[in-house]
Amino acid sequence: MELEKFKPWRDSHSEHIPVPLTSRQNIIIILLILFSHYHHWYWRCRRPTDRWSLLAVCHKHHQRAPNSLPTSKSLHSFLHSARGWNSWGIQATPNTIPSYPKEELGRVLNQKFIISQCTMLTDPATQDAGYDLCSLDGGWYSSITDKFGCITYNASLFDISALSRYLHGKGLRMGLYSQPGTPCKARHGTNVTVGSAFIDHVDKNNNCYFDYENPNTQLYRELITLWVSWGVDMIKLDYVTPGSTFQDTCMPGNLNASAIAYHCAIEKSGRKFQLDVSSDVCRSQPYWGTWNSNADSIRVDTDINPYDSDDFFFFYMQHCTVEDYRQFVNLQVVDAQNDKPVTLRGNLDNLFVGNPAKVKGVTDKQRNTLMRIWIGASSNLFLGSDMRILDDLGRWLITSPSSIAAADFCAMYPMQPRNPGTGSNQAVQLQACITGPSEHGEAYVLLTNLGPNLGDGGYVTVGGGEQKMSVTLADMGPSRSSANRLDLSPRPIHVLILL
C-alpha cells in the first residue's frame, strides 16, 4: 500500500493542513505522518480507502518531547494491560451464537463452552500477539460457599481446577469474575466467624458485605489462597462502589475498600495476579488514589454491549466510553505533571472486532476504529467475539504485527487528547490524540470525527457528514521552538499499518 503524494506545505506562521473527515456515525481515522526534513516539520496525511486506514509512527532523534505520558509497570508488575477473551459479551447477547445452549444455561456458561472459545486463543498468531488470558465472567460460582466461607465454583457447570490445568497446558492463563459481596450463608464459616466481619447490609440477591476496616476481614484472604490453588491469574472485581450501577441491587454505596482487601490478599499470596476493578468507578479523591494504589486497571465506563440483542454491539454505545476515557487520562496527565508514576490502565470493556457485521452489529470501518481506540487507550484487549467464527479482518485486526507493535507502544504511552487549534484536552467532536513521543521520538497520532453527539459524548455537535479540521505540531504537544531545538536530521518514514 503506497502513500498518496502530497506537496509539502507550510507557511511562516504555522504548519496546518485541512483534513476532511467523514462521520456516518462512525469514527474515521486518517493517516498522519510527522516527518523531519532539514530541521523543519511537515505534516502529510492520507485519506482512508473504503476498507483500510492507517496510522503512522513518527520519528525524531533520541530526545523525549515535552508533555509525553509514559507509564510504569502496573501495581502488580505487568508491562501492559491484559489481552485475551472474556465471556460476558456472549452471556449478555446469547442470541448472537446459534450453538449457544440458551434454553439450558441462560446467561451462565459451562466449561465445555469456555474451552470451545478459549482453545481458539492457542492459534499461533493469536498467542504470539499476546492474547493468552481466558476470562470467565459472572456465573461460574456457586451460591453455596465452602466450609471456610469461601466462594467456590458451581460443580454442575465447572471444575475450575481441571479447567486451569487445561488452559495452562495450552500456554494460556485464566481469569475469574468476582464481586465484593458473598452469599450470606457464609456467615458462620471458619473458626473466626465470617459473619463477625460483615456489615449490617443485605442486598436483593441475599449477599452480605465485609467491613474492610475489621482486621478479621483480611482473614478472608483464604479466598485468594483457594483461587491460587486453582491457578487463577487475573481477577475482575465488579460492582465496586462508588460508581458501578448498584442502585437496582441494593448494594452498599461505598465498597472501595474491597479493592484494598483484594490487593493485600494478592500481595500475601505470592502469586502474580492482574486485578481489574469495575465498572465506571468514581474517579474523584480519595477513590482515585485507592485505585492507583491497589489495582492494575479500572473500567472507565459501564458495559458497552446491549442485552438480549441479536447483535454483540452498537457503535453509538462507545461514545460515553470515549468520553470517560478522556476524563480518565486527563487525571493521569495531572498526576504525571506532579511527578506521580502512571501505573493504572484504563479499561474500555470488551473489544468487539472479531466477527463480521452480520454478527457484530458494526461495519468493517467501525471495527477498524474500535481497534485503534482500544489500542491507543492502552486498554485491556479482551475480545468479546465468538472466537470460532473470526473472519479475515478480525484476525488481522487482532494479530497483525503492526497492531501488536502499536499496542505494545501505547501500553507505554497511552493516548491523550490534543484538540485541533488549541491543544486543549476538552471534549470535542473533531478530536486529535497523541501517544508518546517516546524517548526515541516515536509517536502515534489519531484524528477522529466522533460524529453527532447522541447524548453521552460530552461535546457540542458541529455537524454531520464530512468535516474539515486543521492540526499543528504545537497542538500535539511540543511547540515549534522546542521542536527546532531537537536534532531533526532526516530519517526514513516508518509507516505502520495498524489494522
From Swiss-Prot:
Main location: secreted
UniProt KW keywords: Glycoprotein, Glycosidase, Hydrolase, Secreted, Signal
GO cellular component: extracellular region
SUPFAM superfamilies: (Trans)glycosidases
Transmembrane segments: none
Active site: D238 (nucleophile), D303 (proton donor)
Protein's name in the database: Putative alpha-galactosidase 8
Source lineage: Eukaryota, Fungi, Dikarya, Ascomycota, Pezizomycotina
